[in-house]
Amino acid sequence: MDIQLFSKTPSVTVFDNRGLSVRDIAYRRHPDTPKVTEECITYHQFDFRGFLAQSLDPRLNHKEVTNFSYLTDLNGNIIYTQSVDAGNTLVLNDTEGRSVIAMTNISRGENGKDDLSLAVTRTFQYENAPLPGRPLSVTEQVNGENARITEHFVYAGNTPQEKNLNLAGQCVSYYDAAGLIQTDSVSLTGKPLSVSRKLLKNLDDTNILADWQGNDTSAWNSLLATEIYTTVTRTDAAGAVLTTIDAVGNQQRVAFDIAGQLSASWLTLKGGQEQVIIKVLTYSAAGQKLREEGGNGVVTTYTYEAETQRLIGIKTERPNGHAAGAKVLQDLRYEYDPVGNVLSITNDAEETRFWRNQKVVPENAYRYDSLYQLVSASGREVAGAGQQGSDLPSPLVPLPSDSSVYTNYTRTYTYDSAGNLMRIRHSAPATNNNYTLNITVSERSNRGVMSSLTENPADVDALFTASGSQKCLQQGQSLIWTPRGELRTVLLVARGETADDSESYRYDGSSQRILKISSQQTNHSARVQRALYLPGLEWRTMTGGVAEAENLQVICIGEAGRAQVRVLHWESGKPDGIINDQIRWSYDNLTCSSGLEVDGDGLVISMEEYYPYGGTAVWAARSHIETAYKTVRYSGKERDATGLYYYGFRYYQPWAGRWLSADPAGTVDGLNLYRMVRNNPLRLTDPDGMAPLDWLDLDTTNASRDIVKAIYQLNQIDGPHRGVRDTYQRMTESTGMILQETLNNEAVLKGIKQKDKEKKSRGMKFTNSKLKTYAAHAGVLNTLQPDPVYKDGFLNLPGSLGNKNTFPGVELIEDKVKPSLSQYHPDKLGKSQRWKPESSLGYYRVADTEAFITGIRSQYKSSGTDLHAVVEGRIRDHLLANNNVLPKMAGIAGLHAEVQALNYIISNPDIEGGNAERLNGSYIFTQRLVGDVNQDFPACYNCSGIISGLENVMTGRVNNDVRLKRRKSF
């Protein structure tokens, strides 16, 4: 790596006199032209109230085209958005902050006015007072069509039977776009124990749409098919799920160690014997996986870099004594640059081969520009590989053993100043597999298509819907979208007078796919493949004509360590050459791509290697029939017959390195709504199509914090961000209860003599004087589990920064503070105010880090918990990043309520998954107990530095939280 490439390329932010960010400047250099530096400036404009009004990216600002324009209400809530990528949207809220009307798919006419001809309007209905204001229904209307009620919520009453099932007040019937979700019972901790799904009749017909008119549930139920798919779970006393029985009766069981981490898992097929999936899992003191052994006897070990704790090795092998013989199956070794970009990946389990005067090493190497965008990649591919497109290459069968099947390749990537991937140049000289893939990008947006569709940038926007969804995949392949922006149908082959080849999809109320139907004409008959997605189960059938040719149940193991484990159980139509109830362990790489498949005997089924942005470079298997049943590939996502990958909220085109539609979460990853993982697919991955995640838990960008707004706007009933808005309301009510208890206690203390008052107040948790110490109340939601985990009641822990009883390890720095500036003390802040670095209350130095950390541990212990190693590590990192000098206003780093909430998520044994997964599914809320009480309390400078990973801070951070720099020498 050339260090000079990155020299003098800082990220610069320019603020106006109000402290608002008006310019973001980045400097781009390419390693092939290190002396050429391109200045990339993103512009922001704010209105007179300080609310964002416009944003322009480095490319479109030269054309005087605004990427985003916003119109806000008096409180700063965005009510109207103009986007060159995603079209225009209108959102109106009620006085409670709930969405009432949302209008999408608004295009801009040639006259500059909004074109509502294809607009979609959604209206939301809620309970009236004195009921708690829960959602009742959602109405959807496409302009010119009749309105349909697409969602309906039915809540349990208060009968003895409902109480016995813990259903009182719960949403027990949710009618959505796919049918009905019925909750039959709930645990004491609030986790659903029995959930049933019923589908609409004739759901395979994409013209059949849900419409839950009226209030007659019997009329609604008449629209449903008779089949019921019920999932049953069992939990322990703390609410952790122990067993899950899927819709056909297969049972998954898990066990946890004393720290609450997964230690083993088992599967019992319906009518069968229990079998081991994960035999044992061991972890480091920091909670990182060290070793896992599967039920097939295959062992995976993990190696981490001591200084950074980055994952540098994943070794999968059959150990000595294995029935199939000892063998290293995969041995991935990672090398990084200082900031965590992957420089090389080597598979030491593979041999170096020689063919046509070239040395073919099982290694991939990568180079980046100064913005950490991938600009070149080299590796090996199958010698017969052709130009990458939407089709998979033919697999090598059987698994190769000679040197004539692999050759070296190099790929280079070219981007414009807005981050659009413009060109992929592929070179494999030994096989003359040289080609260039060009992407044509609009001159007035970031919309882009393969040049095979058009080479004229002026024609690109016409190939997209008003809301930014691509209308054509390849020449002759039309894309049809639902009013909600979900891909409904892909026309693969249009035949005119005879039936077409197509693939269609149906979604639930959270826009998650529940059904896929593929139709193909063969020999004058139609072959229809159907995949129904249920919790822990994929039900796949194939019919030829009127007869059912195959009935396959794919059991998806929810807890299987790093591997994805799938069991293939045929009810009928099992093909020859594959056993029934075959268990397939799929071992992933750093970005979750499925590289190695192994069966229950520890024998290799298939191996696959990928180009950086997707696409298959190497694919080999022991038999052709087994390759047909590999559906999960790049990034651990399902690949459809279209060649697209389904991520959850969007579809991805691996041959173009672009998303098929604009980001539904908005600008969470910048102004370009089609860019894939910031053009760094080796370091970043996208779990659901909304925002990239750094699985190395490296620094996050400020842009990622905009996801808070998107999460609230989505207001999911189900899905990865489910229940966040409702939890915010719950958190607000909990804070209100603390304040009310304080008032009640003060009323009791009123009139009592001072001596008696002090004695009486000792037994009270909340009084006015104690609230000044607590200052803040925090809560946290985690949605990683099938049943979300919520906890509040976190309060600031005491830690003195006074001259008396100074916190251990702290040395006070006596700055002179003007009396008038005391208004900025947290206890006296009113509405959320901007952090003013030059107006702080002084600084303190952590002179003895170990004494400081010991003091924090002691405070956590006194509150009834232990400081987790991950949180302690973040506190230490925060100290190091600030040269051990911190602002007094921010208090003792690590003692605030929101950091305790973070500590709870990491430590809670009821939450499964690794640290990255736990944090990604966590939402932290903090509210004031002093000053402007019961209002959002932005995370202070210290908390923002500590809560700096994948977790979502839903109540904001102080402005400039990462830019406070002390320029004075102490």
Swiss-Prot record:
The effect of disrupting this gene, in the record's words, is: A double yenC1-yenC2 deletion is no longer pathogenic in C.zealandica larvae.
Q: Region annotation Deaminase domain: residue ranges?
A: 849-950
What switches its activity on or off, per the activity regulation note? Answer: Toxin complex is secreted when grown at 25 degrees Celsius or less; at higher temperatures the proteins are present intracellularly but not secreted.
Q: Where is this site: Cleavage?
A: M690, A691
Q: What is any one of the record's Gene Ontology cellular component terms?
A: extracellular region
Repeat region (RHS), residues: 168-182, 297-311, 329-343, 361-375, 408-422, 500-514, 580-594, 606-620, 640-654
- Cite the entry's keywords alphabetically: Autocatalytic cleavage, Repeat, Secreted, Virulence
What happens when you mutate R650A? Loss of auto-proteolytic activity
Residue span of region RHS-repeat associated core domain: 610-690
NCBIfam families according to UniProt = Rhs_assc_core
- What's noted about domains in the record? Residues 610-690 form a beta-strand plug which closes one end of the shell; the other end of the shell is closed by the 5-bladed beta-propeller domain in YenB.
What binding partners and quaternary form does the record give?
A: Semipurified toxin complex consists of at least YenA1-YenA2-YenB-YenC1-YenC2-Chi1-Chi2. YenB and the N-terminus of YenC2 form a large hollow shell of beta-strands. The shell is closed at both ends, within which the C-terminus of YenC2 is probably found. The C-terminal region dissociates from the YenB-YenC2 complex at pH 4.5 but not 7.5. The Yen-TC:K9 subcomplex is about 26 nm tall and 22 nm in diameter with 5-fold symmetry and 5 copies of YenA1, YenA2, Chi1 and Chi2; the chitinase subunits may be solvent accessible on the exterior the complex.
Entry protein name: Toxin subunit YenC2
**Protein's organism:** Yersinia entomophaga
Organism phylogeny: Bacteria, Pseudomonadati, Pseudomonadota, Gammaproteobacteria, Enterobacterales
